[in-house]
A protein has these predicted regions:
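Flexible, glycine/threonine- and acidic-rich loop/arm segments that mediate assembly and lattice contacts
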Residues: 1-219
């Protein structure tokens, strides 16, 4: 598991004054911190390649997608190459036997999405999504293994793309995120938002990672 927290501090004056559009300064600041925690959680899922048990001096750290996907890793020995339809097909084929074709979501950086737009000649379709995460638009592409959705993630490195089955991943909470009051210091009111959670990978072999990618110059 991993503990994440954000603290808030406001003065009694700030809390008492009814500012335009903000009747409760503490609640307003806590809402902003919750948004930041959501971003931090998403970044941890996408980028944390190590799982750390932790000790008195080192905090615990959960493993993210890079830590969990170990079976279907399409690397190139450190030599970079373009992200192509063939590489995507190879990743789909690698995961297909385990996922029954349910690995249908591609996570990639904004720059790699531009690469996708290039090899689809700008013909990428768009689907309406009832709920979006971090304002990422979702596009689709049909290959011989079926339709995949592309989800742009700003925290992903340009050198890696993930093909996942979202149903096989879950955020599990030992302690759900909640606010807790802290002792008052003089005129300052304090609260903290804290939670403890981890990422569960129910079948990492039904997903794939494409590594050692580069960005070719787009014309």
């Amino acid at each position: 598991t991993q503990i994440m927290s954000e603290g808030v501090e406001v003065t009694e004056t700030q809390q008492t004054v009814d500012k335009k559009g903000v009747k409760d300064e503490m609640a307003h600041q806590l809402a902003k911190k919750l948004k930041q925690i959501a971003k931090d959680c998403n970044k941890a899922i996408l980028t944390q390649s190590d799982k750390i048990a932790g000790d008195k001096t080192t905090p615990r750290q959960m493993g993210g997608i890079p830590y969990w996907i170990t079976t279907n890793v399409l690397a190139n020995g450190g030599s970079t190459r373009d992200f192509t339809t063939k590489l995507l097909g190879d990743a789909q084929e690698a995961a297909y036997a385990y996922s029954n074709g349910e690995a249908d979501t591609v996570l990639l950086s904004p720059a790699q999405k531009r690469r996708v737009n290039a090899w689809t000649n700008g013909a990428t379709k768009y689907m309406d999504e009832g709920a979006t995460k971090l304002a990422s638009k979702i596009s689709v592409y049909e290959s011989e293994f079926g339709i995949v959705k592309f989800v742009v993630e700003r925290d992903l490195a340009d050198s890696v793309v993930y093909l996942i089955d979202p149903s096989l991943w879950k955020s599990a909470y030992l302690r759900p995120f909640a606010k807790h009051p802290l002792p008052k210091i003089a005129d300052k009111l304090q609260e903290v938002v804290v939670g403890e959670w981890t990422l569960e990978a129910r079948a990492e072999y039904a997903n794939a990672a494409i590594k050692d990618l580069k960005l070719a110059t787009l014309s």
